[in-house]
């Protein structure tokens, strides 16, 4: 296993771009997984107990989100010696839903795309 870590310049460009555009953004560790239903329906999986225990551990450690792509991109970027980071759109929050809190689904990618474009512009200039 190899640690999947974003390039700090990419992270900073994304943060600065979000701020400049007035877009709410969070920075931190995310969990990359290879099984969508392993997170959303762990009870149907053969190792459901293990998946649930791991998710609880990630939450306790302050994990911001769970997704399925960034670790591979970050590791390939490290191998190729290119700068890589990630900008996510949170579609829904299963923890809010489980707690009975409002959990609106958001599918509008416009803000995330604008943040990414502005960040790339910053990175090109540096």
Question: Can you say where each PLM-predicted feature lies in the sequence?
Answer:
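Glycine-rich phosphate- or other oxyanion-binding loops that anchor nucleotides, phosphorylated ligands
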Residues: 1-126
């Amino acid at each position: 296993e190899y640690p999947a870590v974003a390039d700090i310049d990419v992270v900073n460009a994304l943060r600065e771009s979000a701020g400049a555009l007035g877009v709410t953004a969070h920075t931190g560790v995310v969990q990359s997984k290879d099984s969508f239903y392993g997170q959303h329906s762990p009870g149907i999986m053969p190792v459901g107990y293990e998946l649930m225990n791991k998710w609880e551990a990630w939450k306790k450690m302050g994990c911001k989100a769970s997704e399925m792509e960034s670790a591979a991109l970050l590791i390939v970027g490290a191998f190729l010696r290119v700068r890589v980071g990630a900008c996510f759109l949170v579609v829904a929050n299963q923890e809010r839903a489980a707690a009975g809190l409002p959990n609106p689904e958001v599918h509008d990618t416009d803000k995330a795309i604008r943040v990414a474009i502005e960040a790339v512009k910053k990175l090109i200039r540096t």
